[in-house]
């Protein structure tokens, strides 16, 4: 295997037999090496296969100045997230998370930690991702010796959510705000506190995440037949009253009309989550 390009002493790019470019990492892998030299395969620690060419180029550019410890811990966090969630994450996370962690470490060392305005919401709306974020802080500490604050666990969690939904970070922030707004409408309509450990709460939050994503992408859940909605309106009339409040709010604030199916599923989820409150 030949070196296609030397990125830094620890990172190179190569082209495999299928003609696909790979980013290869290992300590001292490219020391005193140049394009066309043989790769010292014994030094290879990690191979990145990024299918998106634009992401691959951004990743290589980023790696020119990033310490190898930062690259290693970012890859460790991403692999852990994939394992815990059982999901494929968008390749863009290799750029966004590595860049974020590098600057978070630099800021911390200068005493310039940033407060996370969405920490409370992130803890409650993205529990699995926040748990990964907390574990990521341990990984960063073990790899670099830097203790990042809990706020960073929240930021890392949002980067993971971003990669799950294939969204840009500003959209993730807006999605999170809409989820919290809807939960507040339900909470104050019924004057309840949610049982955040219940399965129905978890399912409701998951539904809201994709509902909010459709809202900002300008897409709708297709409507089938109003018969089911009519049945649910009659059976769960209090939950439907709450759904109508949500509908009014969404149409007023975001100019997004809810379909019959969206009203149906919101009502069913609200009925279930309120029963377990």
Swiss-Prot record:
GO MF annotation terms: RNA binding
Q: Which InterPro entries match?
A: BglG_antiterminators, CAT_RNA-bd_dom, CAT_RNA-bd_dom_sf, PRD, PRD_sf, Transcrpt_antitermin_CS
SMART domains, alphabetized? CAT_RBD
The PRD domain sits at 65-170, 171-277
Question: Which is a Pfam family this sequence falls into?
Answer: PRD
Q: Does the keyword Phosphoprotein apply?
A: yes
Carries keyword Transcription regulation?
yes
Regarding how it is modified after translation, the entry says:
Phosphorylated.
Q: Which UniProt keywords apply?
A: Activator, Phosphoprotein, Repeat, RNA-binding, Transcription, Transcription regulation
A Gene Ontology biological process noted in the UniProt record is: positive regulation of DNA-templated transcription
| UniProt cross-references to NCBIfam families, sorted A to Z | LicT
The family classification in the record reads: Belongs to the transcriptional antiterminator BglG family.
Q: Which PANTHER family match?
A: CRYPTIC BETA-GLUCOSIDE BGL OPERON ANTITERMINATOR
Function as written in the Swiss-Prot or TrEMBL entry: Mediates positive regulation of the glucanase operon (licST) by functioning as an antiterminator factor of transcription. Prevents termination at terminator lic-t.
Full protein name: Transcription antiterminator LicT
Q: What is the lineage of its organism?
A: Bacteria, Bacillati, Bacillota, Bacilli, Bacillales
């Amino acid at each position: 295997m030949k070196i296609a390009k030397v990125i830094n002493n620890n990172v190179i790019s190569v082209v495999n037999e299928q003609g696909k470019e790979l980013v290869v990492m290992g300590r001292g892998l490219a020391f005193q090496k140049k394009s066309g030299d043989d790769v010292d395969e014994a030094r290879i620690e990690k191979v990145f296969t990024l299918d998106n060419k634009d992401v691959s180029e951004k990743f290589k550019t980023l790696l020119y100045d990033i310490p190898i410890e930062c690259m290693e811990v970012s890859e460790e966090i991403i692999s852990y997230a994939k394992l815990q969630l059982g999901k494929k994450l968008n390749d863009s996370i290799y750029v966004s998370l590595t860049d974020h962690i590098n600057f978070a470490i630099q800021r911390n060392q200068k005493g310039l930690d940033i407060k996370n305005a969405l920490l409370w919401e992130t803890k409650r709306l993205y529990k699995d991702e926040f748990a990964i974020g907390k574990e990521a802080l341990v990984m960063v500490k073990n790899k670099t010796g830097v203790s990042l604050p809990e706020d960073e666990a929240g930021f890392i969690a949002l980067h993971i959510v971003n990669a799950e939904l294939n969204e840009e970070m500003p959209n993730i922030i807006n999605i999170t705000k809409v989820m919290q707004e809807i939960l507040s409408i339900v909470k104050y309509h019924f004057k309840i506190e949610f049982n955040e450990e219940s399965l129905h709460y978890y399912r409701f939050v998951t539904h809201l995440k994709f509902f909010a994503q459709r809202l900002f992408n300008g897409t709708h859940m297709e409507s089938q037949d109003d018969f089911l909605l009519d049945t649910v309106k009659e059976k769960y009339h209090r939950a439907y009253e709450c759904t109508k409040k949500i509908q009014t709010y969404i149409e007023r604030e975001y100019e997004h009309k809810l379909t019959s199916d969206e009203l149906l599923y919101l009502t069913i989820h609200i009925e279930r989550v309120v029963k377990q409150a």
